[in-house]
Amino acid sequence: MASGNCTTPTTFILSGLTDNPGLQMPLFMVFLAIYTITLLTNLGLIALISVDLHLQTPMYIFLQNLSFTDAAYSTVITPKMLATFLEERKTISYVGCILQYFSFVLLTVTESLLLAVMAYDRYVAICKPLLYPSIMTKAVCWRLVESLYFLAFLNSLVHTSGLLKLSFCYSNVVNHFFCDISPLFQISSSSIAISELLVIISGSLFVMSSIIIILISYVFIILTVVMIRSKDGKYKAFSTCTSHLMAVSLFHGTVIFMYLRPVKLFSLDTDKIASLFYTVVIPMLNPLIYSWRNKEVKDALRRLTATTFGFIDSKAVQ
């Protein structure tokens, strides 16, 4: 960890979103509200799926884990960002920085793989409906979930090992609101070649694999739906995929913009905005996207309300 007389800094200074004093408190209030909504909606959806027997299906097992990932994702990033709005000296310990980056990569890859598994689930449900109950059993679903968490953990170890090889002799100011790899590469005083290669290979392997699985799944879904003769059948099939497609487009669209655009278009200020979107905003939007026009979730909420407050809702008991 040392290079000559260079020693690892005990703290890093985060530049935050802005250095404008007049914007610190308004931004604090905005992101506190977003974080509160994120936790309430995601934890609420987790609880609803847990208590309602009608939602004990593969699709909702995966959605429950997606909500957990989003709540954890936001918690890894947002509280420290909120603190930087209130602190004059916006510091994070070296260990805290490493742990934040490890958790960030772990949850990013977990979400990416979850979206791929959810696409496969929709493929089996639409293209192989008769075999769906035997293919997507609860045991299979939980094995898939456990496997993707394990793979994401291994990937995060590889990423973090690349970060641990870096030295920071000349600067400890991270031009970001959290410990992401790009601004850390920028201030590294040691060669980043090996670390960068580790990050690119491991990141591309999982994220691109996820995107390929999603694309292949939806090619087969579209081919199957096109062959359905009734308009109602086509609408029902596509409607089960709409929420997932929106979530995939938001998450992977942002990730592709962040990491696959031409080098000449890279800008840390632009990266801050993009990072803000997929670390803070998307975790808030996902439960709303999956619940907004979801009849099963709405019915489950009615049943829970009816049970809790002791009145009968005809729609809830149907």
Swiss-Prot record:
It is a multi-pass membrane protein. GO terms for molecular function: G protein-coupled receptor activity; odorant binding; olfactory receptor activity. Residues 50-57, 121-139, 227-239, 293-318 are cytoplasmic. Disulfide bonds join C97-C179. The keyword Signal does not apply. Glycans are attached at N5. Odorant receptor. Belongs to the G-protein coupled receptor 1 family. This is Olfactory receptor-like protein COR1.
